[in-house]
Amino acid sequence: MEKQSPAQTISLFVLLALMFVLVCMLFVPYLTVLLWSSILAILLSPCYRALCARIDMHAFTRTRHLVSHMNGEDGCTAAITRATRFQKKMLAAVFSLVITLLVTTVFFFIAISLFGQGKLLFDKLSLFFREYDLFEGAKQRSFTALIFKLSRGTVDISTLNVEEHLLRFFGKHVESVFVYTQIFVKNIARAALSTLFFSFTLYFFFLDGEHLSCLLIAALPLRKRASAQLLEKCKEATRHLFKGLFSIAFYQTCVAFVFYGIFRVEGPMALAMLTFFASFLPLVGCACVWLPVGISIGFTSGWMRGTLFLFVAGSSITIIDSFLRPLLLQNKMRIHPLLIFFSMLGGVQTFGFNGMVLGPILVILLFTVIDLTHDGESHYTSIFHDPPAAGVHAQSIHRQGKK
């Protein structure tokens, strides 16, 4: 084999990098379609593979029957193979169409509900602030005087209109919901085309997912074992992310939506969506939504009703968080919750709504690559392993110091 010069090697790498960037630019406009179709394919592929296994078992039984009774005619065997392939195609088509229909229906219902209930909730909040004067009166003046005294006259918040700033803050986010909903309604043709692409992509992910995975492994500039490990970790992270974090958030959202409806809270869908996103917050979690809602019920409908809501909703959501989270996670998601939380925030700011999934997956892939670089080192402890106890960790450090 002819040996390449350094200039030829550099030119080859530059050409490879240029082609990689150009191909990425081709797929960027369809990132949302590719991301969510791949996520749903990863989550539902076990069910699809189980049904495909039943089809293969039935085909094997028929083929063995032909071999034993008809001396294995090649034409019949080929016909069974074609029929099996056709059944798998139909199964993938049914999966993709049903999933697309469900996702589109749920998304459209949530978008329309948020459009109406978001405005209603904002109007109710404005009326609540103006009716009860929470930020005016003797308490506000005494608090202002206390801050002025503690700061020795350097901080004066008497001119700060807290009510106006809060309403402006909520109004900004409600307006964002309106804008996105209007864009979705106005671009209904584009949304329909994206839905078609979503169903089309999902079909091929179900049908040829293993082949596409092999192509991706071969395309990565890593050893085959490392590429397979990286891809498997990505699939595992996606499953655990949705099975643990997002499923818990979904259950909490459903429970909160039911209680918002029972207690006739204005804008139950909008508040339920806020509960979904608040479930990822550390320490406070969903309490930053249902607690103010319970207090507002106490102001508007009586403190007995408000206390009952706080007890019922709070205990139900807390039970889900305390018992369901360990049951679903089962020590599978070993990344620290603080990293998951900030990766979601940073992902949303960087990639938009897709960043809620891309952020945690990128963090997990980063630590997977770090594990690959330390492969074979006996003293290295992976972040995906359970952390050792403090005494064991101290003893290991002491032994390493002696060495």
UniProtKB/Swiss-Prot annotation:
Its main location: membrane. It is a multi-pass membrane protein. InterPro entries: AI-2E-like. It is found in: Cell membrane. Pfam families: AI-2E_transport. GO terms for cellular component: plasma membrane. Keywords: Cell membrane, Membrane, Transmembrane, Transmembrane helix, Transport. The chain crosses the membrane at residues 10-30, 31-51, 92-112, 202-222, 243-263, 271-291, 293-313, 350-370. Belongs to the autoinducer-2 exporter (AI-2E) (TC 2.A.86) family. This is Putative transport protein TP_0553. It comes from Treponema pallidum (strain Nichols).
